[in-house]
Amino acid sequence: MYAITISSTTIGFASAYFPEYMKATFAGGIIFNMLKQRSKIDNLSSEGKREKLTGAVTFKNVRFSYPERPQIEILKGLSFTAKPGETLALVGPSGCGKSTVVSLIERFYDVKAGQVLLDSHDIRTLNPYHARSQIAIVSQEPILFDCSISDNIAYGLEERPSQQEIEAAAQKANIHSFIAELPDVRHQKSADQALTGYNTFVGDKGTQLSGGQKQRIAIARALVRSPKILLLDEATSALDTESEKV
């Protein structure tokens, strides 16, 4: 009788979690199915040309619609050319395709018709990883990681830049003065490292910083790469007037 009572009680407790178990099983199935899928554009592929770019971007009669909404065409025969060293601004209402153009230059998607050329090369013939290594992007919502400011600026590079290069990029992004005033919070310091606010941790998703400060650190992260192509997707939206002019 005791065993029956204990078993019934245990089953009663367990049954309360049954809906959550079913939700977890369903969610797990979706995740594992997604992991099994192969990307149409493989960033780790060894295929494609590895050209050293100069920074020219050309769109030739580009037509594009997102895979989720193939019937809605976002770009309808878009053509333009941006020469190396030129600044090209895309202006238009929300949803007109400005961010789509940025995504196509990064080759997050392939065009439906037409061509995207980097220099004179069709972007589809280039090695994705090699091409993207020469492009830097700053989005409207900057992404920072729970590490130091210095690590956030250097994040993603195969070879870590020197401290001088990091500070030079921060100066160009108009964030160096703010960083220099921060305290060094390291618990251990080597003899050859001076106190510097670049070692200050920014918190999860940069919660210790304002929107403008996060944006400028993201801009510094892009500049330290010395990219051939710099993409700014409303990157100055959170900046004050002075920083935006710089």
List each model region and its residues.
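Flexible, glycine-biased helix-capping/connector loops in cytosolic signal-transduction modules
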Residues: 37-40, 196
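Pre-NBD coupling/linker segments of ABC/ABC-like ATPases
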Residues: 40-52
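Conserved E/DxxT/N motif and adjacent residues on the DHp alpha2 helix
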Residues: 33, 40, 154
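Membrane-water interface of transmembrane alpha-helices in multipass transporters/channels
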Residues: 1-2
